[in-house]
Amino acid sequence: MTRRQAREQAFTLIFEKSFHPEITVEEMISMAVEARYLQTDEFAVLLAKTADEQQPEIDSIIENNAIGWKKDRISRVSLSLLRLALCEMLFIEEVPTNVSINEAVELAKLYASQEDAAFINGV
């Protein structure tokens, strides 16, 4: 699995977690593996778990930098992608910042709109 595919998998887990905050990332992964629609990838699991564990800090950064936007007004797709990018930028040292931003923007173009991609790039 490529890094981009792993990020996409992590994004899916982070996005799904936004609908089910009571379920742990580990439980979500286990259910997905049992249903056979997810092959686990070590990097994807690391990203999803770290984003979940560090969500309060990540969300605080989003709120401080999304000028004119409250977190609850940001779409779940954009919020999940921002969480993914900030997780990589802050907690995964091997990934350059510009790569994290670019990957989140590219995923936004795939799962959201050009406007969402521009918003993510701006934050």
Residue ranges and their predicted role:
Residues 1-123:
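N-terminal interaction/assembly modules
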